């Protein structure tokens, strides 16, 4: 699992 997915940056 990535710590900063695009969904969160989003």
From Swiss-Prot:
GO BP terms in the entry: defense response to bacterium; killing of cells of another organism
Subcellular location: Secreted
UniProt KW Transcription regulation keyword: no
Top-level lineage group: Bacteria
Entry annotated with the keyword Secreted: yes
A Gene Ontology term for the protein's cellular component: extracellular region
Keywords: Antibiotic, Antimicrobial, Bacteriocin, Secreted
Signal peptide (residue range): none
Functional note: Has antibacterial activity against the Gram-positive bacteria L.monocytogenes, L.lactis subsp lactis and L.curvatus H28, but not against the Gram-positive bacteria L.curvatus CWBI-B28, L.brevis and L.plantarum or the Gram-negative bacteria E.coli and Pseudomonas sp 55. Has no antifungal activity against S.cerevisiae, Penicillium sp BKS-TAN2 or A.niger.
The protein's name: Bioactive peptide 2
């Amino acid at each position: 699992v990535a710590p900063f997915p695009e969904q969160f940056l989003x």
